[in-house]
UniProtKB/Swiss-Prot annotation:
BP GO annotations: translation
Protein name: Large ribosomal subunit protein bL35
GO molecular function, one term: structural constituent of ribosome
Annotated InterPro entries: Ribosomal_bL35 (IPR001706), Ribosomal_bL35-like (IPR021137), Ribosomal_bL35_CS (IPR018265), Ribosomal_bL35_sf (IPR037229)
Region: Disordered, residue numbers: 1-20
Composition skew (Basic residues), residue ranges: 1-16
Species: Streptococcus uberis (strain ATCC BAA-854 / 0140J)
Domain of life of the source: Bacteria
PROSITE patterns for the chain: RIBOSOMAL_L35
A Pfam family assignment: Ribosomal_L35p
Keywords assigned: Ribonucleoprotein, Ribosomal protein
Length: 66
């Protein structure tokens, strides 16, 4: 049986934290900032953690990620 490969698109979008969680970056950050408030833009800069509902599915795609 062949080895399971890491999903490369997911590997570029998620980073593993020291405690074993997954860090992700926010959507809606590429353009059209004139329609967003300063507070929205500030919060979009910060990374957040992957929700518990998505964690199991994403972890399966990142088998080879350390």
């Amino acid at each position: 049986m062949p080895k399971q490969k890491t999903h490369r698109a997911s590997a570029k979008r998620f980073k593993r934290t020291g405690s074993g969680g997954l860090k992700r970056f926010r959507a809606f950050t590429s353009h059209r900032f004139h329609g967003k408030t300063k507070k929205q833009r500030r919060h979009l800069r910060k990374a957040s953690m992957v929700s518990s509902g998505d964690f199991k599915r994403i972890k399966a795609m990142l088998t080879g990620l350390k």
